[in-house]
Amino acid sequence: ELGYISTFASSGNTENYVVIQSKSEAIDMLRHLNKNITENPYNDTHRGVEIYKLHIPDVLQRVLGNLFSAVYENYFCWINGYLIFTNSPTALKTFINSNLSRKTLAYNIYYQNYTENISSKCNYLFYSNPSLNNWTSDLYKNLKDWVNVEDWSNINAFAFQLTTNNELFYN
């Protein structure tokens, strides 16, 4: 599993995250890689979760493509089977707090009700809450030409899903 998350933080900033399902050994591999790159690797702990920085600029974009270019600073941690990458320790701490406090989509009743209409098996899922008015983010800049922001501001949930079968995509 691989995901890209863009949130509109209460600070007014857009925070971007890349989430990759992985085993805990991935942290050890990344830490070892860091030791070979820099003499002073970044290391911190927040609420019992170790935070690191991978000192390879734009590594996610280079490995995964331009969709992941918004995460370029590569601060990361491992939580419940997932590597989480973002641009700052503050953003990562916010993610950790939300996860530990269960303030995520998995625990959101509106999202749970909405996902009853979404297949649990898909290759690509885009989910957005346009009513949050986060239309200034990089993701939405490309959509402004064909989307009336006022109309979309009244929509609480929007999803687009792609699934493959026999080398064909279905939505």
Q: Where are the regions a protein language model picked out?
A:
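Signature of soluble extracytoplasmic/periplasmic domains of secreted precursors
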Residues: 1-171
